[in-house]
Amino acid sequence: MLKVYYTFGCPNCGGPIDDEHLLAGVPCSKCLPGRVENLDYRVIYDLLVKNSTLKGYAEYFYDNETFEEIVRIFKRVIGNEPWNLQKYWIKRLAKSESFSLSAPTGLGKTTTLLVYSLFFSNTTLYVVPTNSLKDQICERLRNMGAKVSCNDVKEEYINVATFNRILRHYDNYVSLQPKLVIVDDSDMILKSGKTTEVMAKILGISEEIFQYAISLIRLKRILKFNEDDKELKNKIVELEYKIGSWKPFVQFLVASATLRPKGIKQQALRTLIGFEPSTIQTYLRNIADLYYQGVDIEAILDKISDNGGLLLVSKEYGREKMLELKEIIEKRGYSTGLAISGRKFLNKFTEGKIDYLIGSASYYGVAVRGLDEPKRLKYVIFYGIPKIRLNLTDALNNPSLIVKIGELLNIDVKDIRRKLLFLSPPEFQILRYSLMKDEELSGKLKDIKVNLINIKEKIWDVLKSDNIKKLKADTFLVTENNGKYYVYIPDTVTYIQASGRSSRIISNGLTFGISIVLVDNIDLLDILSQKLKKIIPNFMFKNINEVDIRELKSLAVSSREVSTSQKKKINIKTILLIVESPTKAKTIARLFGRPSRREVHGIPVYETIILVNDEILITNIIATKGHITDLTTENIGYYGVEVGNNEFNAYYSPIYKCYNCGKTFTIKSNTCPYCGSVFISSSEKVVSALRKLSTEVDEIYIASDPDQEGEKIAYDVAMLISPYNKNIYRIKYHEITRNGILNAILNKGKINMNLVKSQIVRRIEDRWIGFELSLALKSMFYERNHGSGRVQGPVLSWIVERTKEYKKNYGWILYIKLGDYAIKKFFRIKEEANKFIEKLNIKINLISERKEIQNPLPPFTTDSLLMDAYDKLGIGSQIVMKIAQDLFESGLITYHRTDSTHVSALGISIAKEYLESKNLNDSFSGRSWGNEGTHEAIRPTSSMDTESLIKDIEDNPNKYFIKFTKYHLRIYDLIFRRFIASQMKPAEVTYSKFEIFINGEKLEVELPTKISGGFSIIYPLKTYVVSEKYSTYLTKGSIIPLFTYAEIIKNMKEKEIGRPSTYAKTISALIRHGYVVESKRKALLIATNKGIKAYEFLSSCCSDLISENRTKLLLQKIDKIANGDVNVDYVLEDLHKEITQISGKLVNSLKLDTNV
């Protein structure tokens, strides 16, 4: 029977524990002897106390008890149960965690914080932006029975103060030494470095630690320019260790924010508090988005015939236009007020003394950001498209804009576009700053700047000479006004934030609002609409003249009544989404808005909002960075597996990684066993973070990769967090897109245990065989860097045998080029070749021609991508897999480890959309190719070709979290074209048969010479032009060619001894051990003397173990385990017998060699 043990997994003592105990949610048998069963956490605690074995479980128990106590106080003072989102916050508060409460107004942030400050019963500082809010908070706290001080500074009290008062009485508030600090609006403390320093001192952060954090930020910025600077990296690690040893003793809570910390001191504070004050999330929206052609405010007033509106004037019109509109509205019998500063206007609006508020359409303006009146505010009217206006002269200091405008004017910018694309973000910022300030640069940046200035001059020349009045791009508009040019960019953030003022929360329901845009430029409306569609699902502007405004008004009014079915009900759930890579975590978080970020045990966690039907998922996303456990190398059993009485107990340890040498190991040690460094990280940190987060949320979705390795990662995660949360689901996606993630969540399931067992067997087999062979090789050759495995063995044998044949048949190769077709001839000695060349006579006859209808190739699988990338681009398999991983994690292609050619209906529709956009509708021929299975073929996730991708990178520089290289673009282009071609009609190919006479020797060849129509438009095949005009090239070489990456991968697939996930790894392992090297020019694979000796030794003593047939049979058994067709115990028993027998042979072989 196979059982998994985790050497560090017990939730109480931190020692070994089996998966059965973890699944039941109870500590190990040492801590809690007896029958394994599900028990309430209170029962577990009592039993541990009774057995005198209580350790780490106490913290979990007290956190739960604290949560329950806060909920009891909440019910007592508020009169009802906390909402789901409030419970999520309370769970985090109960752990004394510092964090930012991210939610729109109306979801109970302030109520939760007031109740918590009441519970806290210790010196508290509650910071608010205004005196009116201070008075409201004080009154509510007094009504709850709290000890409140609203003017004087008092210990053991809740001190409520404005930040301005704190600045005036700075020393008093620092000496107060509060244990809890609550900030209503973090913008106050992030305005400047000085205000940030004030808050740091109130939070008890010493000057020394604050300076360490500032130094850390500076060094990390420098590292972006010197990524390979090892000394700099070590300094960063040292500072991180120093900062990590500091523990905050003040709990810090932030209720809302709109600014991101940008200054170095603000970022230093963020580093120390462990979270980023998050922006207001705009996930709650129940709005009719309307537009009216023109800026006739009176026409809109006639249509609405109602009060309760906010009129926002586009910034370029200024205050004068606001006053003009105020007068017009008042003449129609409505009272108005200017929402420009202060808060008095809001009170009058709430009381019904003002019908319409008028303000500026500015994101940071009080009318957009500070207005919250859910009952009265029904309409938001935009006078003009909300926009950002830039003088073109200033705008052309942005390199990306120079390129985009140059392209619109048909100026050649291709070369500079490519150069900009491959700049790092810091390099790009330096270039932009230099253009702005006209500062000197050097090196490649100097050349790029000169080119950009030349393009700027051409732009001005074309604009003036052609008298151009308007230029429309995808994301902006350039217009001429009185001889001056301006760039207009629709302000999507302001539109979302401002229109959202009309749809707020009342009694756990969302009111209905109406947003109306008075259109002053139809082109800008179109750009705004397209940008909003990318942010808000199913967004659409509707013409106000084409909707029933009376019905919409009625809905807006009824949704504001206390009890109504017209309100959109709010269903909120909190989830933890666990992925493998940090890039993937960031990409998914960004798909659903602008996420907030915090750190849990030093691990980044992104909080975002995912809307699934009518459910709002408050989603925390964290990355495991791959496997979190591996078979232990501690002295346990047979290489980490206890074997006996038909039982196999596999012990898994955390994975340790050395910061200095980069190597990983699974034996507990305070220093690196390879280089001795003390700077070591452990996956235990990740596990601790996962466990902490799992206690906070309703459900957990494990979204590791959809393959055997990903399933084992999912299993390990599920086991290690089971004691803390039972609502664990496995979700799988094959593309990182919005739809891909949503479909995965809607189809959440359970972990595939057969797949997990197959991975465990594969890992045990790899360990047993690998360690036995490596031990023998190291003993035989007295060198540490030796190793082998069952799959590596056959592959090494192929390369060794081919290398031997290559050397045996070495001589001279003559290439005779006939047009673009080449013929090879082999000669043993150079003189023979030269004689042949001297009398060279060539005659070519065209014998016949035939036409053939040829179907396109299917889209790529892993092996075909690796082969084509090498054959067409000369890129090795390891690099291709890394690039494919980047493209997948960036949401650009589907999962890249696949042996399926199947294309889904969505994939087919992407190809159709692309071909239609290129007016190639007639060439479309949708194909699903292979049968539907677990995976799909490798394909793009959208109809964006390479040129469009480049534009997307330029337009959205913060969208992707990888650094694109020319190789990324080439691989993407290869995948894109191959896929599109697979969905096109066949091409017509002309094959020509030639009779070639070379010095009288006859040779017949048939070659493709023409191709037309169908898929060849996108993915042309190689054709040949054969000519009697020839050229020759003589070089040293062999008649037997060396293996290429592509040929090895093809062999592995055909002989069934590899999997998509192991093709590249197998070759790289052989290179790492020094058994194989790559030739520099063509990346051909050559066996070294070391590799030949290792192969000869292994084949002499254990040829069966590394034979193709045995390897194939074992992999087939592992596949059968994955399909549930074979009992895992039988496979392990057979494997153990085989290995122990071979182990004996190896020992005897080594003895014989020693005796000799």
Swiss-Prot record:
Does the keyword Nucleotide-binding feature in the UniProt annotation? yes
Matching entries from Gene3D superfamilies are given as: 2.60.510.20, 3.40.50.140, P-loop containing nucleotide triphosphate hydrolases (3.40.50.300), Topoisomerase I, domain 2 (1.10.460.10), Topoisomerase I, domain 4 (1.10.290.10)
- Cofactor(s) required, per the database record: Zn(2+); Mg(2+)
Keyword Repeat recorded: yes
Q: How is the cofactor bound?
A: Binds 2 zinc ions per subunit.
Q: Where does ATP bind?
A: Q86, A103, P104, T105, G106, L107, G108, K109, T110
What Gene Ontology cellular-component terms does the record carry? Answer: cytoplasm
Compartments, as annotated in UniProt:
Cytoplasm
Q: Which SMART domains does this one have?
A: DEXDc, TOP1Ac, TOP1Bc, TOPRIM
Give the source's domain of life in one word: Archaea
Q: Give the residue ranges of motif DEAD box.
A: 184-187
Q: Where is the Helicase ATP-binding domain?
A: 90-277
Q: Where is the Toprim domain?
A: 574-736
CDD domains assigned? SF2_C_reverse_gyrase, TOP1Ac
> Which EC class does it fall in?
isomerase
Task: Tell me where it mainly resides.
Answer: cytoplasm
What residues does Mg(2+) bind to?
A: E580, D705
**Residue positions of the active site:** Y895 (o-(5'-phospho-dna)-tyrosine intermediate)
**Which amino acid positions bind Zn(2+) 2, per UniProt?**
C658, C661, C672, C675
UniProt xrefs under Pfam families: DEAD, Topoisom_bac, Toprim, zf_Rg
User: Could you say which EC number(s) this protein's record lists?
Assistant: 5.6.2.-
Indicate the family of this protein. In the N-terminal section; belongs to the DEAD box helicase family. DDVD subfamily. In the C-terminal section; belongs to the type IA topoisomerase family.
Q: What else is known?
A: This enzyme is the only unique feature of hyperthermophilic bacteria/archaea known and seems to be essential for adaptation to life at high temperatures. It may play a role in stabilization of DNA at high temperatures.
Domain commentary: Introduction of positive supercoils requires the cooperation of both domains. The helicase-like domain probably does not directly unwind DNA, but more likely acts by driving ATP-dependent conformational changes within the whole enzyme. A beta hairpin in the 'latch' region of the N-terminal domain plays a regulatory role in the enzyme, repressing topoisomerase activity in the absence of ATP and preventing the enzyme from acting as an ATP-independent relaxing enzyme; it also helps to coordinate nucleotide hydrolysis by the ATPase domain with the supercoiling activity of the topoisomerase domain.
Q: What protein does this entry describe? A: Reverse gyrase 1
| Source organism of the structure | Sulfurisphaera tokodaii (strain DSM 16993 / JCM 10545 / NBRC 100140 / 7)
Q: Which gene encodes it?
A: rgy1
